[in-house]
Amino acid sequence: VASKTLAGPHWDEDYARDLARRNYDRSFHPKGIGFQIGAIAMSGDRTERLATLRIPSLVVHGTVDPLLPLHNGVSTAEAIPEAELLIFEEMGHDLPEKHWTQLIEGIKSLSNKK
């Protein structure tokens, strides 16, 4: 259920099951998600640190992300000097295969900048 909720309208059950199986086989640490959420909550606002970045940056965000609304991606891109923002319509908090080609093009474009 969580996978489907986070994914948005392009959820692929077979892909989600395969990914969950591979993640479980690779590293099963039930307390890990709690530690990760705690670390995120305790880390505070990163805006000032993002402003110090001097590297090509591509911020990728979906319009229907239930975990981090779109304004978070916009704010992140605005905080990083010269960052590019790639917004995927109807994408949740994952990256479905239908967007891979456009993401690859965005990364290639970014890598060609000096």
Task: Show where each model-derived region lies.
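Acidic catalytic loop of the alpha/beta-hydrolase fold
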Residues: 64-68
